[in-house]
Amino acid sequence: MKEEKTMLKIITLGDSNVGKTSLFYHYVNGEYRYNRPPSIGPDYFIKELKVENKHVFLMVWDTCGQERFQAFSPPYFRGANCYTLCFDIHNEESFINLGKWMDEIIKYCYGNIPFVLVGTKSDIPRTDKSISKARIEQWCKNIEDQGIIDKVHYFETSAKLSQNVTELYNVAAKLALEHYSIVKYISIIRPIGPPEEVKVGTCC
Ligand SMILES: Nc1nc2c(ncn2[C@@H]2O[C@H](COP(=O)(O)OP(=O)(O)OP(=O)(O)O)[C@@H](O)[C@H]2O)c(=O)[nH]1
């Protein structure tokens, strides 16, 4: 029998300049690109891989963190199986704005929200102004305590030094497959249409 092919959608989110495109570019091309112009719109690529012995197509979306993109972003938030939520570990504002990005994700999801938290630019040594590991752990714990997700998966990455880039996308792919299976299961057991509060099909 022909193996069923599964398309999983992963969306990269976070403030402008945190290094989203550099991560995305590194994952696609296996290298760091210096002097890249800022993103002017969303971009994506599709990669074929095996996740837990299942043949899947990973559709990874890069977005730009600018306000003008956020104003038009809802179509890109929808239909995701996992989000990679990025902040720069040396940029306080990008860490504080994680709450804003979470609010956006929550609008389009229900149940356990599949996301991976990514602290970027780990090749730059931490200073007093950087976000401490203790603060990041506290942020993860708050999210877990609110029941938004059972366990936050956190990676500190460097696109520049190739640290944790593949690892983060491997975990995102695994979470995306789990989410895909749950949504598929719900749509099978509720074929006539979901009750209003479940909103299958309009969420991630
Ligand atoms: N040291 C270091 N710098 C990085 C790393 N990743 C990205 N940068 C730098 O951070 C800046 C922003 O990187 P981008 O990948 O363009 O950031 P972005 O989040 O996609 O920005 P927008 O497209 O505006 O949303 C660039 O100058 C990169 O060279 C990293 O791992 N280490």
Curated annotation (Swiss-Prot):
GTP binds at residues 14-21, 62-66, 120-123. It is a lipid-anchor. GO terms for biological process: hypotonic response; phagosome-lysosome fusion. It is found in: Cell membrane. Gene3D superfamilies: P-loop containing nucleotide triphosphate hydrolases. One of its GO terms (molecular function) is GTPase activity. SMART domains: RAB, RAS, RHO. Its main location: membrane. A motif (Effector region) lies at residues 36-44. GO terms for cellular component: late endosome; lysosome; phagocytic vesicle; plasma membrane. A lipid is attached at C203, C204 (S-geranylgeranyl cysteine). Keywords: Cell membrane, GTP-binding, Lipoprotein, Membrane, Nucleotide-binding, Prenylation. PANTHER family: RAB FAMILY, RAS-RELATED PROTEIN RAB-7A. NCBIfam families: small_GTP (TIGR00231). Belongs to the small GTPase superfamily. Rab family. This is Ras-related protein RabL.
